[in-house]
Amino acid sequence: MGGHASCPQGSVNAGAKAAALLCECDALNESDRAILATVRDYVTDPFGGGSGIAHEDPRFGRLSAANGLMETKDGKLRLSMDTRYGTSMPSEELKAKLRTVWGSRGWSLPSLESREAFHVDDNSPVPEMIRAICTEMTGVDRPCFRMSGGTYSHYLPNGFSCGVSLSAKGATLGEAVGSDALSFPEGHGGVHQPDESLDIEGFFSAMQAIAHVVLQCDELLHN
């Protein structure tokens, strides 16, 4: 079952499962099995435990390291890894660890890009303002939270990330899946799944909330 790089808990990587199976295949030579053993060992745990890069950030929680693509090109196996990490680990430190752990198995990292994590200042009044607007519109008081997702707010001097994952009955889509609000069974309808869902009435309600957020942000930032 696939998952999202920002929250991979409960997901299963198909490539890692295939690599683990092929490691037991006597028809493959020792060199090929060693290559596949690295995939099995380093990719199975989406939180970096297998490759030794596991890290807990006080703001964002556990580092996640998700493999998205595997391919053979020019006779070599190539992988892509999407690693999400917080503000307490410098990017150069993580790069050094990645080069060391993969290099120890004979792998090279021809492309290694990173950027520092984005987060809203702990003293900013904006998250509480967004929470208050959502509480007023839905009648449900929820805390703000941090997640390891990519955001264009990273490029904006006064950018703040907020989403549209509300159902018409006021529950978040995560709360609503499998309930009376949305009739999807567990494991279906979630983000980036083949049957990803969006509650239309909830979407329009969220647009109204975001309009209020934009106006309130403008007032906070210019007064």
Where are these regions (language model features)?
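Midchain, well-structured core segments that form catalytic/ion-binding scaffolds
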Residues: 1-89
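Generic secondary-structure signature for well-ordered alpha-helical cores
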Residues: 23-31, 103, 107, 135, ...
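Zn-dependent metallopeptidase/amidohydrolase metal-coordination segment
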Residues: 73, 133, 140-220
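Redox- and metal-dependent alpha/beta enzyme cores, enriched for Fe-S-associated oxidoreductases
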Residues: 91-106
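Conserved active-site and cofactor/substrate-binding residues in soluble primary-metabolism enzymes
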Residues: 9-20, 62, 89, 93, ...
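A short small-residue
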Residues: 1-4, 108-113, 187-194
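A short beta-alpha structural unit
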Residues: 38-44, 66-68, 82-87, 108-127, ...
